[in-house]
Each structure stands twice: as C-alpha cells, then as structure tokens.
A protein has these predicted regions:
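GST-like domain detector, emphasizing the conserved glutathione-binding G-site
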Residues: 1-126, 130-133
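A local structural micro-motif
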Residues: 28, 175, 196-197
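Long hydrophobic alpha-helical segments typical of transmembrane helices together
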Residues: 180-206
Length: 206
C-alpha cells in the first residue's frame, strides 16, 4: 500500500495526488497541518517537508521523483513520455512549474494566507499578479494547438494544474484572454482525477 504524507493544499502534494488518481491507485493519506513538524516526516525526509511517499520500504521525499516512480512502477509512459523529445518537453515544463511558476505564485499565496485581507501588502500582490500574467502568456504559447502539455495528460499537467488550482483558490485563476491556457485548465477541471485529488481546504488567516 502506498502511504502519502501530505498537506492538502500544498501544490507539490496536490500534483502527486493527481498522478495517483490518474493511475487509479489506492493509497493511504496522512494529513499534515501547515507548519507541523510531523515525527515520521522528520525521520523519513532530510528536508523535513511534505510530500513524503512510502511503499514496501521504498521512501521518496521529492515530488518529482514520486511521479517518476509512479510512472515506472504503475504506468510506463503514462506520466513521462518514452519518446526523447516529448520526455524533454514534459520534464522541462515540470521543472518550470516547480521552480519559476511556484516562486511567482508563492508570493501571492503567502501574502493572502498569512494575514487578514485588510492587512495585505497590495504592492506585493500587484507584482505577483504581473509576474503571473507573464507566466500565463508563456504557458499559453506552450499549450497552443495541443490538448495537454505532453502527448497525453501526464506529469507536466499534474504539476501545472496543481499550481494553477492554488492560484485560482486565492483569486488569481487563469485569465480568459489566455485562451489556450484557459481551455486547458477548464478541461483539466472536468477530469475525474481533479475532483478526486482536490484539496479539502486552503490555509487562510482569520
């Protein structure tokens, strides 16, 4: 049995849940609160952060490696294409999501969840929104003429969908002018895996 230590609204955890759902895999979820130092997570992961996934003595503490593992073990080619050019594309987009898009959206999310709305730093939010528009434009060009970011719904789509989903939850969804990206996200939201993997809640300041 796969065990996933996770925080429900963490985009790294969300993308892993999406992959598990797309592969129709059963797993046990251990939920961790924001800021909690869970003893098992501290023991299994050198970073002390979620997600952490274990199965039959195999421990994986990096979300991208989790998708590699799931693809290799349960669905060769389902998440990571086997053709070299498409594999490079999917892995590059996955990295873009984790590093560049993640850094852009984290500023907005952190500001909105860490303090009441009346205390938000609007300069931080406006800059994050400008950066998000740049990312949307770039992604819109990458998805033009394609149904998914890979040859089928896979690792890049899981990663990007989770990031965009978090942005939408904090009031910064895909803008309609980015028609290709908007169409893609609407299609993702109709997939059964989206509902199955959707967070049970999002952190916010009261």
């Amino acid at each position: 049995m796969i065990t996933l230590y996770q925080r429900t609204d963490c985009p790294f955890c969300w993308k892993v849940r999406l992959a598990l759902a797309e592969l129709s895999l059963h797993y046990e979820c251990v939920d961790i609160r924001l800021g909690e130092r869970h003893p098992v997570v501290q023991e299994l992961s050198p970073s002390g952060t979620v997600p952490v996934m274990s199965e039959n003595g195999i421990v994986v503490w990096e979300s991208g490696v989790m998708l590699d593992y799931l693809d290799r073990r349960y669905g060769p080619g389902r998440l990571i294409p086997t053709a070299a050019a498409e594999e490079v594309r999917v892995r590059s987009l996955h990295t873009y999501s984790d590093r560049l898009l993640g850094a852009c959206l984290f500023k907005l999310v952190k500001e909105k969840r860490s303090r009441p709305a009346a205390e938000w730093d609007q300069d931080v939010i406006r800059q994050a929104q400008r950066d998000w528009r740049v990312c949307q434009q770039w992604l819109d060009a990458r998805i033009a003429g394609r149904e998914f970011f890979g040859p089928q719904f896979g690792a890049a789509d899981c990663a990007l969908a989770a990031r965009v989903g978090v942005a939408a939850a904090y009031g910064a969804g895909v803008e309609r002018e980015f028609t290709n990206l908007y169409r893609w996200f609407e299609a993702v939201r109709r997939r059964p895996a989206w509902e199955a993997a959707y967070p049970t809640g999002f952190a916010s300041s009261k």
